[in-house]
Amino acid sequence: MAIVKMKPTSAGRRGMVRVVTEGLHKGAPYAPLLEKKNSTAGRNNNGHITTRHKGGGHKHHYRVVDFKRNKDGISAKVERIEYDPNRTAFIALLCYADGERRYIIAPRGIQAGVVLVSGAEAAIKVGNTLPIRNIPVGTTIHCIEMKPGKGAQIARSAGASAVLLAKEGAYAQVRLRSGEVRKINVDCRATIGEVGNEEQSLKKIGKAGANRWRGIRPTVRGVVMNPVDHPHGGGEGRTGEAREPVSPWGTPAKGYRTRNNKRTDNMIVRRRYSNKG
């Protein structure tokens, strides 16, 4: 894929940068793998806002993606690469030798016609899925499980990947893009290569309306609110924050560590912020 900078024919297109999608499927998605997706607009069952800045947006179906890749030993041919409105990565439609079709996260460099396979005996080839114990040290991987058989949870977004650093006993060490080094059970599965659509981070939407299409509502700064609405609010005329930056609920907003899961602390070998002050 490549990117293209749009000509400034209007205020909304000035500065807009898009990802060229020439190789993507132009037709409808595979209907048996679609599910209804209801929008909650960030509200809970009481109608209270639980996630701010959500609401509206275009309706779309959920594409059921196979994150487990547990159809071992059966070759699958990539039929096409598709756009998925639910994620930054593209998805690939696989057709297995027995006729079943499944969506997977499309790895970088994958094209229609490529044959993939999963299982312990699979070759070390981009798009193949194997248990980590069967993957050589130094291999770039993505779609990594955290528990055997649960399905991929790590490195699933566009351009994401991790590197297998070492294997010792029942655990392997994997370095994530954030710099964190984490222990993963060697029976967990991972896919060879990195996630495609790596130019996603270079996109510029160009106008506020493009975010509204995505269901993202405006974000209002705390300093322009009233004191009842935000710790930064109030004051006569234009005023600063008058304190350290915080969330509407008083939690420090810049660099404050919020991780609170001591149960899995022993799985982290090196924290992602170990190089920061």
Swiss-Prot record:
Region of interest (Disordered), ranges: 37-60, 223-264
Pfam families (alphabetical): Ribosomal_L2 (PF00181), Ribosomal_L2_C (PF03947)
Gene Ontology process terms (BP): cytoplasmic translation
Chain intervals with Basic residues compositional bias: 50-60
Record field: compositional bias (Basic and acidic residues): 229-244
Keyword DNA-binding found: no
Gene3D superfamilies recorded: 2.30.30.30, Nucleic acid-binding proteins (2.40.50.140), Ribosomal protein L2, domain 3 (4.10.950.10)
Polar residues: compositionally biased ranges: 39-49
Keywords associated with the record: Ribonucleoprotein, Ribosomal protein, RNA-binding, rRNA-binding
Cellular component terms (Gene Ontology): large ribosomal subunit
One function term, GO molecular function aspect: structural constituent of ribosome
Functional note: One of the primary rRNA binding proteins. Required for association of the 30S and 50S subunits to form the 70S ribosome, for tRNA binding and peptide bond formation. It has been suggested to have peptidyltransferase activity; this is somewhat controversial. Makes several contacts with the 16S rRNA in the 70S ribosome.
Family designation: Belongs to the universal ribosomal protein uL2 family.
Assembly and binders: Part of the 50S ribosomal subunit. Forms a bridge to the 30S subunit in the 70S ribosome.
Protein name: Large ribosomal subunit protein uL2
